[in-house]
Amino acid sequence: MSVLLFGVSHRSAPVSVLEQLSVDDSDQAKLIDQVLQSSLVTEAMVLSTCNRVEIYAVVEAFHGGLSVIGQVLSEHSGMSLQDLTKHAYVRYAEAAVEHLFSVAGGLDSAVIGEQQVLGQVRRAYASAEANHTVGRTLHELSQRALAVGKRVHSETGIDAAGASVVSVALDTAEKKVGSLAGRSAVLVGAGSMGALAAKQLMRAGVERIHVVNRTLPRAAKLAENVRSYGITAEAFPFDHLPPLLTDADIVVTCTGAVRPVVSLADVHRGLAHVREPKELVICDLGMPRDVDPAVAGLPGVFVVDMERILREPTARAAATDADAARTIVAAEVAKYLAGQRMAEVTPTVTALRQRAADVVEAELLRLDNRLPGLDAAHRDEVANTVRRVVDKLLHAPTVRVKQLAGAPGGDSYAEALRELFELDQHAVDAVAGTELGPLAGGDELGSLAIDLDMTE
């Protein structure tokens, strides 16, 4: 059995799709119950945030498990399976492990390095555990992911990476138009990056912030938060953007959309009513870009995009922290997978030792029958000698096979051991079931990774 991830996030879908897929606490339990009704799925967990909905499951078969999860999410969202898969990404086995570790480390967030997602992973696991839908595989995977996330945040400066991008953009803007103190700003996007941008704009001394977002309630919530700091703020839907540009000095965009949301026509309309010539700075923090590239060619408009931002020393330092975090994730993935492979060979080794013990006991019984007059002391000495010989013969190969099993492709060594010593697979499975204890499941990790959408 392997881990399968089926997800949709800000990287693969527009906000409208994420809204259709949104999952609250009661929805989570319902979704998992539906997924687990299939015999192909043995464990499941839902990770739901404002920027992603992901189902992690332990499945008996890749295609069967994928079909089950896709159908459940299709019914939940009201989208056809065909439309859903246009925005979905799939990770399997090693790739699923790497993805969850990256998510926990803040590397897949709209704001690189944000810590909120670590708590969201913890709550996703706690909810699944409370509903008894995680077994040994997802338990171990989740606990390791949480540990990796903590390590990334404690050993790198990635926490400041997102803030660095915004601050570098605003510093660049000030070089063009001077101090932002007392200025008017338009903020396009009210997600986690938008909240961070609002904070940086307030620190820069802006007098007024107009928050524009596809969903007005979300914009209103951010505007209310801004007002709590004594700054004038109002919320507007997207179609109000052009008139807001007329009085704006700076625009910051960070929507996470998959295509530009600020068009050349929008900016044309906004600047058409400007009474006196002015410079407008637009900081496009979107990846991919939020602003139509043609906007940069308009007179009086200066666009600061991610390409320009990442050329700045501070932003490059933040990128270095992200690279360091990715290095940690890669090392932890390799360590986790090696541990899983070693754990998989353990039942085979245990079955081999049990087989050897059974042979020893059978031979000692045969000895008792052939030499009934053998006194207890001599009998014990013979028994101990035979057991020591068997233990010494088995020690080197069993230790070595565990070491070799930790390497990629190491499962072949366990198979060779079963063939060489004619170990009954049912006996090995019985040992494995005993060693798993109350947590069901296992993790036979392969290397298949599939994308239904290459934007992820």
UniProtKB/Swiss-Prot annotation:
Pathway it works in: Porphyrin-containing compound metabolism; protoporphyrin-IX biosynthesis; 5-aminolevulinate from L-glutamyl-tRNA(Glu): step 1/2
GO biological process, one term: protoporphyrinogen IX biosynthetic process from glutamate
Record-linked Gene3D superfamilies: Glutamyl-tRNA reductase, N-terminal domain, NAD(P)-binding Rossmann-like Domain
Binding positions (substrate): T49, C50, N51, R52, S109, E114, Q115, Q116, Q120
EC assignment: 1.2.1.70
Keyword annotations from UniProtKB, A to Z: NADP, Oxidoreductase, Porphyrin biosynthesis
Keyword NADP: yes
Function: Catalyzes the NADPH-dependent reduction of glutamyl-tRNA(Glu) to glutamate 1-semialdehyde (GSA).
Name this protein carries in UniProt: Glutamyl-tRNA reductase
